[in-house]
A protein has these predicted regions:
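A conserved mid-domain beta-alpha-beta active-site/ligand-binding segment of alpha/beta enzyme cores
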Residues: 129
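Internal alpha/beta domain cores that form substrate/cofactor-binding pockets in large enzymes
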Residues: 2-124
Length: 129
């Protein structure tokens, strides 16, 4: 099975670095690029053939950016992260959107894997202890 290609395009830098640190530990994922300019996300997603684009939550909730990115790269799953790390959102075509209530590293990786491998599926978080 091929690796899930992840493009990091989120701010602040500390959040991007934290996400990168989690992804590089995943045997089935690879970081294929990092971009700081939201205007360059579309070009970078096309150039890297990313499966996942990680954006800041403000960018992921920007209808123009998301709709344009999904129109040009329909295979892409968008992961939007809040800068303070307590909210995450996964967006795909068809339209499909899932808020992750507990955005721990394990839950984010599980959600990304399912979103990429089963596009549009209803992902369920594990029950709280």
């Amino acid at each position: 099975m091929r690796s899930i290609k992840v493009l990091l395009a989120n701010d602040p830098a500390i959040l991007r670095e934290a996400v990168r640190a989690v992804i590089v530990r995943q045997p089935d994922m690879e970081v294929v690029g990092e971009i700081l300019d939201p205007l360059g996300v579309l070009l970078a997603a096309k150039a890297t053939q990313a499966d996942v684009v990680v954006l800041g939550l403000r960018d992921a909730e920007e209808p123009g950016l998301v709709s344009h990115l999904l129109a040009e790269c329909p295979q892409v799953t968008i992961l939007g992260l809040a800068p303070h790390g307590d909210t995450a959102l996964i967006v795909q075509m068809r339209p499909w959107r899932k808020e992750i209530v507990d955005p721990s590293a394990a839950n984010l990786m599980r959600a990304l894997r399912q979103a990429v491998r089963e596009p549009g599926s209803a992902w369920h978080e594990p029950p709280s202890p």
